[in-house]
């Protein structure tokens, strides 16, 4: 139950440093070069532009089910190279015990690029 352990206490100022935004998935490709089965995903964040990410979510989501889905992502982490692919944002989700991820999304249509707070 390692996932259930609470992490160290963070301050409100720590939280304010993280820029979490609403985006819409506009492209999903198989990421064959990745070590674990993954997708390459392009996300439209409105005025922030289109950003790329990778996600190990193929067991719970088919590519066609992800297109046009709104998601929530951290947009101000430094880019990370994954098997030669530049991942620019971190898509947020709920971590299940088996390691699968359930994507977080607004419960209503939200303007692209709007902040989560």
List where the protein language model places each region.
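Phosphate-backbone binding interfaces of nucleic-acid-interacting proteins
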Residues: 2-117
